[in-house]
Amino acid sequence: MGTLVQTVFETQAAEIRMLGALGCEATTLGNHEFDYRSKGLAKMLETAAESGDTVPELLVCNINWDAMEQQGFSEGQQQIRDAFTEYGVKDYVMVQKGDVRVALLGVFGKDALACAPTCELQFTDPVEAVKKTVAEIKKNEDADIIVCLSHSGTSEDESKSEDEILAKKVPDLDVIVSAHTHTKLEEPIVHGDTYIVSAGEYGKYLGSLSLEQKADGRWGMKEYKLTPIETDIAENAATQEEINSFMATVDTDYLAQFGFTREQVLAENDVAFDSLEDLYNIHTEHNLGDLIADAYAYAVTNSTDYNGTPVDVAIAPSGTIRDTYTKGNITVEDVFNSFSLGIGADGVPGYPLIEAYLTGKELKTVAEIDASVSDLMTSARLYMYGLQFTYNPHRMILNRVTDVYLL
């Protein structure tokens, strides 16, 4: 999620097909795979399976199909199960690389599930599922190395760092390729003989880990590096042609209904907008968040469906803002990227705007979320149109706001 490519998630399965075109042999599920709900994920997998393209193995070992079957599958659960069968989703797979037999398994983390409110699937405990899968691999496969693809992530607080907990509790894992928390690890995290690696977010880096086998059969690191993906890297013509083909479908299958094209220029910008990092990490007014909140109010009052009810307040949470704007031309693609998450009740990509009536007391509670909670959960920083408040950061949490007023 985060670019126009997601708008053809169901109809083209562009992301997973591109992974296959790039030679990726295996991947796992992330929380954003569920953003288009069960039907969307199922349709994407069916599209990929029926495309005829080479696609990566999809690995996840901790889906609790037994519990769902005992309770009776919901329509969405059944759709995903059927699509998993068609695609060939597995707990693990064996890959031969030269004279090395590699076992690859995938796991879906606890926080990933907490970040997927539309996910209908049930999962078993990630650590216990990985333990069970590793035991099965060791019993049935002649694996030289065991690699876990984990959408669980790491944290500065080691006691809450899911992939570090996994490494400690399943010491037979040789490598954990860690995702979900967007962490850029300059050096692997090492627990025992297990290496945890992560190359950050959004394809900014290509991670490379070179290992050599030790006398005891485990593996030691020879080299680890993160290569920045920058514009000076020579273009691969075949890859670019594949990308262009998918992007053309974005115009025809999605943007055409709104009368736009991807590269259409909407505005020329001479403003230095704040970075996403600042938007999340610095608790203050930010022009990017304020602009988007203002845009929400403008969109409502200029809609053909506007009924004349005044818009007093509009709120843009930082967690829904996915990109900033640079100076120069701002295109349709740039605007979509900046708040690209979600899907409406009509099935069209992009969160719809919703209207609600709040009392003064409730507006104070909204302000308290920003004042008290957003330092603990930075995706909850709130950028507002029409609402202003003062707060004292030294007061007790959830009792910091002293004044709230409408502008």
Can you name each region flagged by the protein language model?
Residues 2-8, 15, 19-22, 210-407:
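Solvent-exposed loop/linker segments at secondary-structure transitions
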